[in-house]
Amino acid sequence: MGGVWVGCAVRALVVWDERSSEAQRVAERVRRGLAPYADCEVCAVGRCGRIDADVVVAVGGDGTILKTAHLLAGVEVPVVGVNVGRLGFLTEFSADEFLQSLPDVLTAKPSRRMMLDVSHQDASWCAVNEGMLVRVGPPRIAHINLFVNDRFVTTYAGDGVVVATPTGSTAYSLSAGGPIVVPQVKALLVTPLNPHTLTNRPLVLPKAAVVRLEPADGRTEIALSVDGQVDVAVKQGESVTIRASQHAFLLVERQDFFVTLKTKLTWGGLPRYGKR
């Protein structure tokens, strides 16, 4: 196992969800546990500036992980998630598990999760889960054109379109009927949101594909969302480009992906048959 943080001069940053007093309490407990191994600072995730550390411990839920990723902005620093939220698909460790396994955590090789580069006009963002165009305002059907490698593919009619990473395949895309894709696969997933048709199905594209989404008309207000952290209006005549990032999100995992699927999402269980 290739340890990337071992040494006496390790700089650790513990970030916590400022909306949760429990997360703040756990963050301080984590800081004390890390003290023998690293120079440690603690910061509310919404108040942190540019992250300059060798490892980040994110205390909260999956939203805290996503905020941390946006603060990193493509800088490849290992992130450990300590869960005090409800689901915690990315925040795999409990506080007790993290503290009890600190030697293993400090020598673990992080998983390299594919990210997306999402650009609109002159702005760009990195995404761990997804970038998507979604209708806002009155309940009208949104019409969104899909281009792949500058070639027109189709026009989606519905509530929007999600472009997800394999990590994001268990997030919003899953709720919209998209496939579950293991994180080691390098692909882009295109999932329509509530399509007003019986024929549109999710697409799985190669990592090299460049996706472009644009409103087909101006009758419906449409917004761009990036990991739930960015909310930007997209007008007719504008477009959003999404491609695989050159950077990876480094996530320290506690257990096998399929174990997480079963324990967090109760995936793959048998029906509860009654007695014969």
Residue ranges and their predicted role:
Residues E76-P78:
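Proline-centered loop/turn at the N-terminus of a beta-strand
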Residues W16, G60, N83, P215:
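Short beta-strand/turn micro-motifs composed of small residues
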Residues L87-G160:
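Catalytic core of DAGKc-family lipid kinases
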Residues G63-A69, T170-S175:
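Short glycine/serine/threonine-rich phosphate/pyrophosphate-binding segments
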Residues G3-V55, V59, K67, L71, ...:
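ATP/NTP phosphate-donor binding region
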Residues T155-D159, V163-T199:
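Gly/Ser/Thr-rich active-site loops/lids in small-molecule metabolic enzymes
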Residues V57, N83, G131, G228:
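A residue-level signal for conserved active-site and pocket-lining positions in enzyme catalytic cores
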Residues W125, L133, P138, N149-F152, ...:
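ATP/nucleoside-binding phosphotransfer catalytic cores, i.e., glycine-rich phosphate-binding loops
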